[in-house]
């Protein structure tokens, strides 16, 4: 059972949650003054239109027609499936649906914001985009978006994933991008981390620092971000806006689930439904799933912290493990981040979104089961949502409740098979930090 919308029903507007949050979003702070950051300073890092969108309090922002056409070209609208085989296997009264973002040409949701960011960069005459990537899904998406727009792309890929997922970097290079393992010798920040540990596994926080340092050396370059900031999450709401139309063909969901690293795929599916809750029009349960190796929502602190390890970004108020936290080299590279989106942090802090965390072994077990039953090999990141869905369906069986679960299968795992191989051969390692929570992420003890 599936629903595929015609091209004409690709959303025409992105949904911006800022005006609907239960409390005002704390402003990003300039690290030099500790005052709200001047948007003009951000324009040296980001495309001007993206800075404007980041600060906008308009509830809806029009999707440029050229971007909508490209959405169609790369596989939007994506299909929504019912996981009937999984339901039967679990013998649950729950009905399980999933939005499959792995159906895009790059294999994940990341292309939704990559196309938008590259479009605005091209309009502003930007010649080069520089970014970070964890598992490589975001780097792949921006590489293609740059190719389609005629913009050069450079990607700093967290070293652990660079080594675990060699074909991701091949795919980025096919699309014309330069790819470097992070930390690298390209930047002073990279050299610093390598001097501390020549075999440093890297992290999203370090890769972000390297990308920004790179951009600041080139007037015609700008930084492109794959998650965390609100304009990125807003571009992803095409997922939830499509899913709302598709679920009308079936039934309303009761529970909405997504994995979280920075928060973009969760927000993409959930925020259009969160709006109904904030407006008092409906009730849903929202579950945000993170790895126990990077438990920013479940074990972090809610405070101001840098968005990167090298302290180049503004300070953001968010759930954080501290920007110097060394994220273990789990296979879900896209979830290896010390913080989480400020807008999602507000929703977690207000009890609207419930966070949970899992070890990677149990996540891969759920992923392998899903692959055997439904035929799709999920990305390790997306598999966190599958594990939570299975647990929720089992709970529904135990309690005798007929509930409807909708989760985001944010990407396929066909280039993540090394992680599956380690799972099948019993070599996966689980990581869980012992020294959390930290008291002050801006001044952690050495």
Curated annotation (Swiss-Prot):
A GO MF label: pyridoxal phosphate binding
Keywords linked to the UniProt accession: Amino-acid biosynthesis, Aromatic amino acid biosynthesis, Lyase, Pyridoxal phosphate, Tryptophan biosynthesis
InterPro entries linked: Trp_synth_b-like, Trp_synth_b_CS, Trp_synth_beta, Trp_synth_beta/beta-like, TrpB-like_PALP, TrpB-like_PALP_sf
PROSITE patterns per UniProt: TRP_SYNTHASE_BETA (PS00168)
EC numbers, comma separated: 4.2.1.20
This protein's pathway: Amino-acid biosynthesis; L-tryptophan biosynthesis; L-tryptophan from chorismate: step 5/5
Pfam families: PALP (PF00291)
GO cellular component, one term: cytoplasm
Sequence positions bearing N6-(pyridoxal phosphate)lysine: 110
Enzymatic reactions: (1S,2R)-1-C-(indol-3-yl)glycerol 3-phosphate + L-serine = D-glyceraldehyde 3-phosphate + L-tryptophan + H2O
Disulfide cysteine pairs (residue numbers): none
Cofactor(s) this protein cannot do without: pyridoxal 5'-phosphate
Subunit structure: Tetramer of two alpha and two beta chains.
Role noted for this protein: The beta subunit is responsible for the synthesis of L-tryptophan from indole and L-serine.
Family: Belongs to the TrpB family.
Protein name in the entry: Tryptophan synthase beta chain 2
Species per Swiss-Prot/TrEMBL record: Pyrococcus furiosus (strain ATCC 43587 / DSM 3638 / JCM 8422 / Vc1)
Lineage summary: Archaea, Methanobacteriati, Methanobacteriota, Thermococci, Thermococcales
Gene name per UniProt: trpB2
